[in-house]
Amino acid sequence: VIVLDGLRPDYVTQEAMPNVYALGQRGVVCANHHSVFPTVTRVNSSTFSTGCYPARHGIMGNTIYVPAVDKEQGFSTGDAKNLMKLNEVTGGKVLTVPTLGEILESAGMKLFVASSGSSGSSFLLNPHVKGGGIVNTEMVLPESAKAHVDELLGPVPDEAIPNAPANRRIIDGLLRIGVDEHQSNMIFLWVTDPDHTAHPKGIGSVETTAALKHVDEEVGRLLESLKAKGLDDETNIFITSDHGFSTQTGKNSIPQLLVQRGVKKSLASTDVIVSEGAVYVDNHDPDKTRAIVEVLQSTDWIGAVFTKAKTSGDIDGSVPGTFSFDSIYWDHDRAGDILTDANWSDDANDKGWKGTTLLQGVAGHGTSSPYDIHNTLIAAGPGIKQ
């Protein structure tokens, strides 16, 4: 399973990505494939490793609030150290359902993870470090394997845009360790581009176009290497992405909005804690929750607003005018009292690429826009129809 971070389906053309395109031509292209909402990386890496929505796996965003880890603010799930702390305080329940690594092990099979993405997204693919473990740019698990990995692959290269040196090194790791040494039954390969480049440089930029060319060449190298090893006829290849991508034009933040409108005491106060789009209200105060929802609903850059279901399974939230957590499979013990979405449009950027959201930044993802929701899935191999 090859995850090309942030790969929009419309990036994949014969001209821009000939190797990925050709794989689809000899296999299948899933035109209606979709990301899990919120359309952020660690929510979806958890879904890859569990087959579940956040309502079951418990990773609610790229940043999550768990009082047992930090009572005053949310923490980034991009750092594996934070997730290890969550794993510790929950008795091994960083993800609250069984993972693929565990399921494969119970069947006598091995998982291996090779990733140039964040340590957090890598950890969530195999949090119990089953099979051949994890080789990531920022960490190696089990730690006892690090010296051997560094000896085989050499030092970790400096970060670049596109992040070609790191991506090449991690694919070398897949081949030399995941395939040659462990003979893994299943491998997750996570390539940090085009996301890594598109965030600061934008969709359609020279740099992002170069990133697409680079990752396509690396996919081609991987496929040729498997063929040279005589493994192409017995390997099913899935190329996917964790989310799509949009141009971002927003200038505002939810904490500032709530403070300005008098429903949060200060940016640092704990009466209301904001963790990305999730809002946690002290003691789940229903009046405060309703007041915050009303502020959000009257703000033009805020899109859909979600609250706990009025009744279990209902599409309507408990606060009038909101959708329910159940409608997006987000109801979990770690869920906030409110979840917000940013507004979005079909507007094109200066390079002609459609999809614009009112999140802050140059380009990114996270909303319910079809340009964020619609991700890539291409598959080919002996077990897949042609």
PLM feature segments, named:
Residues V1-P9, A22-G24, F48, L104, ...:
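Beta-strand elements within well-structured catalytic alpha/beta cores of enzymes
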Residues V3, L7-R8, A16-N19, V29, ...:
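Stable alpha-helical elements in mature extracytoplasmic
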Residues D5-P9, V29-C30, V36-V40, P54-A55, ...:
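Solvent-exposed loop/turn segments at secondary-structure junctions
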Residues G6-Y11, S35, L86-G91, G101, ...:
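Second-shell loop/turn segments in exported
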Residues D10-I59, T63, K110-V113:
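Short, structured active-site-proximal loop/turn typified by the sulfatase FGly-forming signature C/S-X-P-X-R
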Residues A31, P38-V40, N62-V89, P127, ...:
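Secreted, luminal/periplasmic, and some membrane-associated catalytic domains
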Residues Y53, I59-G202, Q297-D300, A304, ...:
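His/Asp/Glu-rich, glycine-adjacent segments
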Residues G352-Q386:
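Low-complexity, glycine/alanine/valine/leucine- and proline-rich hydrophobic stretches
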